[in-house]
Amino acid sequence: WPSYERDVYEDGKLASNADDTDKGQLKGLIIARGNMVVDYTVVPVAPDSNDYDMSTEEGRTAYQQAYNEYAKQQEYYNTYVEPSAILSAMAGFDKLVNGIVERINGILCPEKTETRTNPYLNADGSEIQADTYIYNSVDKAVLYDRYGREVTGTDNGDGTYSYASGEKLYESAGGAAVTVDSYEYLMLDMDKTGYGMDDNKTVGTELFSRIGTDRYIKTTGDNGETIYLRNNLNETDYESLYKLGNLKINPEAAQNVGKIPLSTVQGKEDFDRAKELVDIWDEKFASLNPDMYAKSDYMSFYNNYIGEYATMGKALYNYVGNQTTMVDGYDNQRLQSEGVSSDEELEKMIKYQQAYNAASRYVNV
């Protein structure tokens, strides 16, 4: 509504019978369909206390910060995604696909994290994007990414704020870059990786790849050895995720299965890695949505996913049927008291026509 300078429907306001905001077919369709495209990243994942050193103040603080971030993500999900059956279905299915893809690729290409104070460089001297940029003490509560979007920092309690971002941050939209304190890089773990059966003993060949995106950037480490840094940018320099619409079977692996790293460095079959691939189907994967705390394996997750939306669809179908029956019943009652019967009206028209004709003949005579 341009004249009122407001939206016709407020996205963040839930439909409520008490507020009389649950009426209208168009509004119902918009809520069910949603107004955006979502993927697995909108599904919040609760932090696991086992991943933090809860015996130290630093560990407890880090866990609390992670949980606070999870609470914010959960609120967003419950407000904008969960009310839409289509959006929540999209996010849930993408989470399942991403979980399987990343787990299989992670076994074939085991990785480790390196934290350093200076970035790795390409052969041309350009900086290789890190997996995480760490800012420990910034005097601004809000910074900006390269698209001009606001990024809120974590209050350190001393007037400064800390940030952990997947890309560099800036003081203002289009402004100067903030000095990075440390860089975190994901890289292929050469101590744990498998090797291909080809002549080159290829490493780092994933089974599922992203469109227009290589998994690794090959460069040289500080000790002069070749390292493989995780690459998260596609050919157009945008972030590339393992999600629906951006996945394909790795052509390199499909055309030459010998490059799939399922052998040891001695050229023997890597039975331990093969067993690990088999065992992932029995691992606890994730919960279906943020309101469910119990985790399921992949098959149970899929069954729960199908069951939840089948039940929801059946309930909505029955609800629509009941509402239609009720409306038809009220309409029939209205017609009985105030409506017009076409047969009755036709009978009256014929009667009056015959009476008119008879009266006309009488006058003529």
Positions of the model-derived regions?
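Structural signature of extracellular appendage/secretion-system components
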Residues: W1-V365
